[in-house]
């Protein structure tokens, strides 16, 4: 798991106007919370934070005002829906050795059996519990040779040592569908529309 060091400043200005001023300076407003402490409102460096968030479940080592060092993981990231820049981030305070609940991305590898099958992600991220400094970046699942009707459940996924499922083991994560079955309703709808027009 990667750890990124960021310098943060506490902030005392709040509201939309203050947030706009912070973003204009290429910084991002954020909140650090957890362990029963009061939320701490922060200003974080925009570019460095953006680079850090490219890694899922990144561990962030915060140097706050040059006085306090804390570890955190991102819990909620708000982006501008059009331009994509960071608007706000919520960080969860963590301690080394502490177990946290997170979602790790699921990555399928391998080729499905020949015959025009589609792979559907029922869950694109798997809820797990892991030690805060050892959160996997992703889990990889082999789908090689699977045919329509096959599914992979949460309990079928091999997890790294120290990582436990935080979801029912019978939860379907991936399933294989027949491409022809997916196309059939579309053709039927087209015929119905043609009949209606006639």
From Swiss-Prot:
The keyword Ribonucleoprotein applies. GO terms for biological process: translation. GO terms for molecular function: 5S rRNA binding; structural constituent of ribosome. Keywords: Ribonucleoprotein, Ribosomal protein, RNA-binding, rRNA-binding. One of its GO terms (cellular component) is cytosolic large ribosomal subunit. It holds the Pfam family Ribosomal_TL5_C. Part of the 50S ribosomal subunit; part of the 5S rRNA/L5/L18/L25 subcomplex. Contacts the 5S rRNA. Binds to the 5S rRNA independently of L5 and L18. Belongs to the bacterial ribosomal protein bL25 family. CTC subfamily. This is one of the proteins that binds to the 5S RNA in the ribosome where it forms part of the central protuberance. This is Large ribosomal subunit protein bL25. It comes from Streptomyces coelicolor (strain ATCC BAA-471 / A3(2) / M145). The lineage of its organism: Bacteria, Bacillati, Actinomycetota, Actinomycetes, Kitasatosporales.
